Regions:
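Phosphate-binding site recognition
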Residues: 1-177
């Protein structure tokens, strides 16, 4: 049994790849949507268990923002590291604990080939706005280079972007978490 998150769909699921009996749930599925991170109630309980209740707002501001199915989810890696830092120093400031934990070569490759429209959309996201895009939840690594529009599917399925509201069948409203 394994759970893979923050990656594109695995291609060629078969008995010959070692990935048979494979079940895929995407970020938009509501089944188990609260199981892929911490809910706000769980974050409150965690902070309370260490006497850190006064740090809820900063924790929410920094680490809440992911949407799985119908659930707003906190990033567990960031929350755990922040609580650990606060246990060592109650004046510790929130940080981006994900920095330099993954290779961003794929994102850099997309940005190099981005046209002006794509660059403008990236700037809108960085400015805190949202964009509306069609997303391929079934996109695999073998298909990535097929279109610059796959950038949005990659950023969404790997957690760099999250939903802003409920998606329609043809359109996802995306923002930076």
């Amino acid at each position: 049994f394994a759970v893979l998150t923050g990656c594109l769909r695995v291609s060629k699921e078969s008995i010959f790849t070692g990935l048979n009996n494979f079940r895929v749930l995407s970020i938009t599925d509501i089944r188990f949507d609260e199981q892929f991170g911490f809910t706000e109630e769980e974050v409150k309980m965690l902070l309370a268990s260490y006497g850190l209740e006064s740090h809820l707002e900063e924790t929410k501001k920094w680490y809440d923002g992911y949407r799985f199915g119908d659930a707003d989810i906190y990033c567990p890696w960031d929350v755990i590291n922040h609580v650990d830092s606060l246990c060592v120093n109650s004046n510790a400031h929130p940080q981006s604990y994900w920095i330099n934990t993954s290779g961003n070569d794929l994102v850099k490759r997309f940005i190099k080939i981005a046209d002006n429209t794509t660059r403008d959309e990236i700037e809108r996201l960085v400015a805190g706005e949202f964009i509306e895009k069609s997303i391929r939840l079934d996109l695999t690594y073998n298909e990535i280079d097929g279109s610059i529009n796959n950038l949005w599917s990659v950023l969404f399925t790997t957690g760099y972007l999250t939903l802003d509201g409920t998606p329609t069948p043809n359109s996802f409203r995306l923002k930076i978490p």
